[in-house]
Amino acid sequence: MDHLLLKTQTQTEQVMNVTNPNSIYIKGRLYFKGYKKIELHCFVDTGASLCIASKFVIPEEHWVNAERPIMVKIADGSSITISKVCKDIDLIIAREIFKIPTVYQQESGIDFIIGNNFCQLYEPFIQFTDRVIFTKNKSYPVHIAKLTRAVRVGTEGFLESMKKRSKTQQPEPVNISTNKIENPLKEIAILSEGRRLSEEKLFITQQRMQKIEELLEKVCSENPLDPNKTKQWMKASIKLSDPSKAIKVKPMKYSPMDREEFDKQIKELLDLKVIKPSKSPHMAPAFLVNNEAEKRRGKKRMVVNYKAMNKATIGDAYNLPNKDELLTLIRGKKIFSSFDCKSGFWQVLLDQESRPLTAFTCPQGHYEWNVVPFGLKQAPSIFQRHMDEAFRVFRKFCCVYVDDILVFSNNEEDHLLHVAMILQKCNQHGIILSKKKAQLFKKKINFLGLEIDEGTHKPQGHILEHINKFPDTLEDKKQLQRFLGILTYASDYIPKLAQIRKPLQAKLKENVPWKWTKEDTLYMQKVKKNLQGFPPLHHPLPEEKLIIETDASDDYWGGMLKAIKINEGTNTELICRYASGSFKAAERNYHSNDKETLAVINTIKKFSIYLTPVHFLIRTDNTHFKSFVNLNYKGDSKLGRNIRWQAWLSHYSFDVEHIKGTDNHFADFLSREFNKVNS
């Protein structure tokens, strides 16, 4: 039987305890999925053998019944029984994570009591007048300032108010101390604390960076199934739409050079235990690709043609994140770190029934995968689901796109904690990272194919390289599709993209036979000449006022998103995004006023993630639009689309500013035809 001396005191006694130099209150922080951060004033009690917490500061779902109830003696000599326990809880103190194996539930008038079991776990525990120090299992001492005033937040309704998106008002904290400092030496100690921290700042930063490096080392490996690091928690299953059907695609022919390369790669895959010999009735051909990325790496990449298998299997509808939504999360952030999962899909184990479906042929024979292979249509969704489950609790400072992890913070102090928490989560789940691809503590970073730098963003340099490396004379529709795909990827950064694409897009129609003329070659040269670089665009901050400017011509519409940046009393309008498009055949017959209205609607749709739920400004040179939004259409069937447009626009909050057509230079440029502008 464990015995615990609980000091059940009156409020006066609690005040005396807090202000007494020998009693210790420190700040602590708890994180739970679905809740805001919970900040507590924790009482460090070396006379208590256990850690104790109020039921009002830890969500009910985290409490479980203790295997054996604990009988506890309290100050008046009587006994109480504690039957609820919370296991493996992380308590954040001074931006450091302290793991507590067990915390017991008991109402003591204090939110959280740090008992002697904690002090022994992180010994030596040293107490000074103004602070305490824990050092065990740390490569540096952790200094924690004592509080001169303590409060209790854990009351009825507190946890409900701390739920994310909760509209419940947080209860007022209960004061359990006074501001009085009985020991005058404490005032001197507090004043000197700033000087001490300044002297130790460089040392502490270096030590924390060393800790980050140690954590990174724990989770990095060249083997995605490293037996010393993987927890093999990610699992997947793939099903055929018709289980009775065998999916067979005939083998390919290989050159002697390819056969030699297959010998090396198949041996590597067998050594990694990601494949094994197969007796599956299914088969798909493997082949080697040697594109730009492979040439830079100096190694061809083995690919399996799963086109037939993908048609025959049931898909996974789990959505990948919207890239624009991810970018809105990092607005205003100053410091970044990014991590790449090592061969991410290979960290997901396939169940035994699914493995035969991945069977492939190559010069060495017939093999199947033990893990999720690249090329299966379900692979990105499967992996994204697992990553979201692992990192969702950290979404305020971390976003994940398939196997790319980005950590973002306002300052270096926060970032040290954020990166440590992400790496500890990777270690906990056995998520293995690539060390050579890790980028730590950067103000400028690459993510999602973008270069993010000091509040601006633009496509990475290789996007422009791909565009310029395309030949002026294209061979077939597939090559043209690849070229247009690259342009679309960078659409936010290319004014007039719709006009640029249209003459080329017309060549992809099914009923149009492939033909490439001298005029087409000249047009390709013109397109590439006009894409010599991508301007860095501003990433609008949440507090900045937004503007959209729009315009329409007979065939095209154009728009852009701008933000007003205030610097030392001066307003500067910065471009954030471009948008353009061509009107459909029926829309080309609309009145010019309707085309201008449709240009506004299309532009809002393009930038909706930034325009909800904020109030923004619409600028247009169309005099009709300002009156249109205030007109009251009364069910005239001929005006049906105007009624629909008004209803749609009513979901947004905006003002309308009319500008002269002669002043609307840029939006007008966006809507005019590319050939006319560049002829």
Curated annotation (Swiss-Prot):
Limits of the Reverse transcriptase domain: 272-452
Disulfide bridge map: none
Molecular-function GO term, any one: endonuclease activity
Active-site residues per Swiss-Prot or TrEMBL entry: D45
InterPro entries recorded: DNA/RNA_pol_sf, Pept_A3A, Peptidase_aspartic_dom_sf, Rev_trsase/Diguanyl_cyclase, RT_dom, RT_RNaseH, Viral_Replic_Matur_Polypro
Reaction catalysed by this enzyme: DNA(n) + a 2'-deoxyribonucleoside 5'-triphosphate = DNA(n+1) + diphosphate
One example of a Gene Ontology biological process annotation: proteolysis
Chain spans, region Protease: 40-130
Record keywords, A-Z: Aspartyl protease, Endonuclease, Hydrolase, Nuclease, Nucleotidyltransferase, Protease, RNA-directed DNA polymerase, Transferase
Enzyme Commission no: 3.4.23.-, 2.7.7.49
Record SUPFAM superfamilies: DNA/RNA polymerases (SSF56672)
Domain notes: The polymerase/reverse transcriptase (RT) and ribonuclease H (RH) domains are structured in five subdomains: finger, palm, thumb, connection and RNase H. Within the palm subdomain, the 'primer grip' region is thought to be involved in the positioning of the primer terminus for accommodating the incoming nucleotide. The RH domain stabilizes the association of RT with primer-template.
Recorded family membership: Belongs to the caulimoviridae enzymatic polyprotein family.
Protein purpose: Encodes for at least two polypeptides: protease (PR) and reverse transcriptase (RT). The protease processes the polyprotein in cis. Reverse transcriptase is multifunctional enzyme that converts the viral RNA genome into dsDNA in viral cytoplasmic capsids. This enzyme displays a DNA polymerase activity that can copy either DNA or RNA templates, and a ribonuclease H (RNase H) activity that cleaves the RNA strand of RNA-DNA heteroduplexes in a partially processive 3'- to 5'-endonucleasic mode.
Name of this protein: Enzymatic polyprotein
Source organism per UniProt: Cauliflower mosaic virus (strain BBC)
